[in-house]
Amino acid sequence: VNYQAVGSGSGRKAFIDETVHFGATDDPMKESDIAKVKRGMVQIPMTGGTIAFGYNNPGCDVKLTQQQAVEVALGIINNWSQVGCDDQKMLWVYRSDGSGTTAAFTNSMQSFSKTWTLGVGKSVGWPSGVGAKGNAGVAGVITNTPGAIGYVNQSYVKDKILAATIQNKSGQFVKP
């Protein structure tokens, strides 16, 4: 078995094109995609991965309300001083490829606040920031860019990447 983490969009295409025999995604296939699979398929629900706000600002313990999380992703909050850290420009990093991680992340952002304007999907029109391919690409940009913040699968929160805590509905700040 040779599994390649290429992102949900690329993985779906490879499965539909019959260049792979199986795949995994954070965003289940829709009927329109399933209809394109000529050989047939079985979709099996499984546990999803946790998504973290990963950041590179080692001197700051980041705690975001749900509204602040949305404002970071929209580029409204663009300086670390706006979330209680030292004055430093914040760089938003997002997935540039079609991604189940993006679909799950944007779904959360939409549930957090009515000010979320980008909708929900594997790809959205980010108003600012830098795109990178795959979780590994986003993690690479965050690791190599002081002040960067973005969304990644929790397994990428290591070394220079820290995880922000997010306030839940009951008011507690929790790590992913």
Predicted regions and their residues:
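Exported/periplasmic ABC-transporter solute-binding proteins
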Residues: V1-P176
